[in-house]
C-alpha cells in the first residue's frame, strides 16, 4: 500500500471534537512536508446533509465539485490545504445506495447481499478511492458517531478488515472523554476504559488514546489509562478544553508530540513541524487587540451557532488579520426587538438560508443598514434580501419579492433559475460548487479581490431576475459581478453607501485563519471605519 492510513474514532460521548482533531493533525503532518488527504465517514442514512435541518446537523459545507457535506469538512479546509471533493466524504446512505445499485445491475451474480461482506467491502473501496484520487503520503479517516452505536458497526468492521490487511501502514487513534466529578474532586477513567473495551471487542486495538478533559490529566491518570486500556504510557495523549479559540488545538497537539509519535510508528521520518506563523495569530487571539467591532448576524438559526459555522469563523479570520477584536451578535430576524440591537452594531451580515420564516425581518435589517449607512454584507439569501428591499423602498415596486416567498408577487425581482422548476427531487439538485465570476473594475469587490476573475462556491436555486437588472442599475444598485458562462448576477453593490454588498455565492467556504477571504476583510474594514466615525459623532 503506497500510503499510510490514520483512523480516528470516538467514544464515551458525541461532539468530542474529532473533526477539529483530524483537521489539526492534518496541519501538523503537512507542516512536516507530508501530503495529506482526508475522508469523513458518516453513519447516518441520509445520502448527504443537504436536506437536513440545521438545528440537527449544523451547516452544510460545499466543496468545489458541488458536494454537500458535513461541517467537519469546513474544519479540514480551514486548518489545512487538503483537496476536498466527492472523494472526501461518504455516508451510510451513499454506501447502501451503491450496493443496492450494483445488486440491481446483477454485479453480485445472485449472491445474498449482506452487510458483511458487501457493505464493508464498499466502505473499504471508498477509502481506496480517496487515496487513489489524492495520492497522499497519509490519509486521515474520521469515523462519525460513537463506538457502541449500532450505526457505526459496519464502518468499524471495515476498518478492522483494512487494518488486518495493511497492519504496518495503519494507525488507530481513539478519542475519549475523561470527566471531572466536582463532588469527588477527581477525574474518572472508567468511561474511557469501557469505550476502549468496546472497540477492542470489535477487533480494533487502538495505537493511541487521545483523552479530552476539562483540566490537564496528571501522569498518574495517564498511567492508569495506559494500564487498563493496554497501550504504552507514551501512547496516551491529553487535550484540554481550549481557553480562547479552536485554533489553539494544533499547538496543543504539537506540545503533546502526537504527530511525531504517529510518524515514527508509521515509519515516516520527517522534520519537526513549523508552526511559527500559526503561533503569531494565536498570540493575537490571546491578547487584547487595539480595535473592536460588533457585527450583527441576522438569521433564523442563530440559537445554534453550528448552523452558520463557516460564517462565524470567516468573520474571526478577517478581524484577526486587521488586528481587530470582534463581537458577533446573533440576532433572530423573527424577534420583534432585534432592530434595536442591530442599531448598536458596526456591521450587519445576513447569511444564506431558505424559506419564508424570518424573511421580512431580514428585509427590515437591510433597510435599516441602507438608511443609516451601516455596512451590510448579504450572502446568498442575504443578497436576495438586499435586492428585494431595494426594489420595494428605492424603486417603489410595491410588493416586490422573491418567488420563493410569494409565487404571485407582481414584481418577482428574484426568481427560480432556468431548469430548476422542472426538478422534483430536492437533494443535490441546486446550483452547487465552484463557478467563475467576472468583476467590474472600480468597485468595492474589485478592490477587495485585487483581480477581475474569481472562482466561488454556490448553493442556490434562485437568482436576480434578468428582467429587472436594468431598473436596478438605473436606481443605483449595480451588478458588479457576473458569471461569464450564463451571465447570471453574482454580486451587487449599492451606490452612495460605505459598504453594502450582496453576493450570490458562499465566500465563507474559502476563508482560512492564515488566508482570510477578501470580502470578509473588506466588510470588517468598513465596520471598523463606521465604528471610528460613530465614536467621533
Curated annotation (Swiss-Prot):
Which amino acids does the record list as binding CTP? 14, 149-151, 188-193, 224
Keyword Nucleotide-binding on entry: yes
Catalytic residues per the record?
Answer: 380 (nucleophile), 506, 508
Instruction: Report the GO molecular function annotations.
Output: ATP binding; CTP synthase activity; glutaminase activity; identical protein binding; metal ion binding
What else does the entry mention about this protein? CTPSs have evolved a hybrid strategy for distinguishing between UTP and CTP. The overlapping regions of the product feedback inhibitory and substrate sites recognize a common feature in both compounds, the triphosphate moiety. To differentiate isosteric substrate and product pyrimidine rings, an additional pocket far from the expected kinase/ligase catalytic site, specifically recognizes the cytosine and ribose portions of the product inhibitor.
UniProt xrefs under HAMAP family: PyrG
Subunit structure comment from the entry? Homotetramer.
Protein name, per record: CTP synthase
- The organism is Chlamydia caviae (strain ATCC VR-813 / DSM 19441 / 03DC25 / GPIC) (Chlamydophila caviae)
Amino acid at each position: 500500500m503506497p500510503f499510510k492510513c490514520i483512523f480516528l474514532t470516538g467514544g464515551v460521548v458525541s461532539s468530542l471534537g474529532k473533526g477539529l482533531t483530524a483537521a489539526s493533525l492534518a496541519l501538523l503532518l503537512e507542516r512536516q512536508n507530508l501530503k495529506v488527504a482526508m475522508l469523513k465517514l458518516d453513519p447516518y442514512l441520509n445520502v448527504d446533509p443537504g436536506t437536513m435541518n440545521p438545528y440537527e446537523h449544523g451547516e452544510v459545507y460545499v466543496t468545489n465539485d458541488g458536494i454537500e457535506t458535513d461541517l467537519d469538512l469546513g474544519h479540514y479546509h480551514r486548518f489545512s490545504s487538503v483537496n476536498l471533493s466527492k472523494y472526501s466524504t461518504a455516508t451510510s446512505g451513499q454506501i447502501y445506495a451503491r450496493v443496492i445499485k450494483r445488486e440491481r445491475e446483477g454485479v453480485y451474480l445472485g449472491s445474498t447481499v449482506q452487510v458483511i461482506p458487501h457493505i464493508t467491502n464498499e466502505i473499504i473501496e471508498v477509502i481506496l478511492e480517496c487515496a487513489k484520487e489524492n495520492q497522499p503520503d497519509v490519509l486521515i479517516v474520521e469515523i462519525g458517531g460513537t463506538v457502541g452505536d449500532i450505526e457505526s458497526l459496519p464502518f468499524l468492521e471495515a476498518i478492522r478488515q483494512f487494518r488486518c490487511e495493511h497492519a504496518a501502514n495503519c494507525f488507530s487513534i481513539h478519542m475519549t472523554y475523561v470527566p471531572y466529578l466536582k463532588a469527588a474532586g477527581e477525574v474518572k477513567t472508567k468511561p474511557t476504559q469501557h469505550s476502549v473495551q468496546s472497540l477492542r471487542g470489535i477487533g480494533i486495538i487502538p495505537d493511541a488514546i487521545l483523552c479530552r478533559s476539562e483540566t490537564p490529566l496528571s501522569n498518574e491518570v495517564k498511567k492508569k489509562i495506559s494500564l487498563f486500556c493496554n497501550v504504552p504510557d507514551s501512547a496516551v495523549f491529553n487535550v484540554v478544553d481550549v481557553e480562547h479559540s479552536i485554533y489553539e488545538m494544533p499547538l496543543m497537539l504539537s506540545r503533546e508530540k502526537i504527530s511525531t509519535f504517529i510518524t515514527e510508528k508509521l515509519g515516516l521520518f520527517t522534520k519537526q513541524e513549523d508552526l511559527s506563523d500559526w503561533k503569531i495569530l494565536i498570540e493575537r487571539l490571546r491578547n487584547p487587540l487595539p480595535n473592536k467591532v460588533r457585527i450583527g448576524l441576522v438569521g433564523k438559526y442563530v440559537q445554534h451557532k453550528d448552523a452558520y459555522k463557516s460564517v462565524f469563523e470567516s468573520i474571526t479570520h478577517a478581524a484577526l488579520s486587521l488586528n481587530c477584536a470582534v463581537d458577533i451578535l446573533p440576532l433572530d430576524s423573527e424577534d420583534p426587538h432585534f432592530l434595536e440591537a442591530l442599531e448598536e452594531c458596526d456591521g450587519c451580515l445576513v447569511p444564506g438560508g431558505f424559506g419564508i420564516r424570518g424573511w421580512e425581518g431580514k428585509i427590515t435589517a437591510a433597510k435599516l443598514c441602507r438608511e443609516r449607512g451601516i455596512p451590510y454584507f448579504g450572502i446568498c439569501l442575504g443578497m436576495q434580501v438586499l435586492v428585494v428591499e431595494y426594489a420595494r423602498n428605492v424603486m417603489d415596486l410595491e410588493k416586490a419579492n422573491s418567488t420563493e416567498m410569494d409565487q404571485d408577487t407582481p414584481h418577482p425581482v428574484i426568481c427560480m433559475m432556468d431548469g430548476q422548476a422542472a426538478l422534483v427531487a430536492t437533494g443535490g439538485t441546486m446550483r452547487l460548487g465552484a463557478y467563475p465570476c467576472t468583476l467590474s473594475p472600480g468597485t468595492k469587490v474589485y478592490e477587495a479581490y485585487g483581480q477581475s476573475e474569481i472562482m466561488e462556491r454556490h448553493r442556490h436555486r434562485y437568482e436576480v431576475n434578468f428582467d429587472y437588472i436594468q431598473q436596478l442599475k438605473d436606481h443605483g444598485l449595480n451588478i458588479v459581478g457576473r458569471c461569464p458562462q450564463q451571465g447570471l448576477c453574482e454580486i451587487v453593490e449599492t451606490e452612495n453607501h460605505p459598504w453594502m454588498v450582496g453576493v450570490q455565492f458562499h465566500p465563507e467556504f474559502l476563508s482560512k485563519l492564515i488566508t482570510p477571504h477578501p470580502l470578509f476583510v473588506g466588510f470588517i474594514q468598513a465596520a471598523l471605519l463606521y465604528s471610528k466615525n460613530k465614536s467621533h459623532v
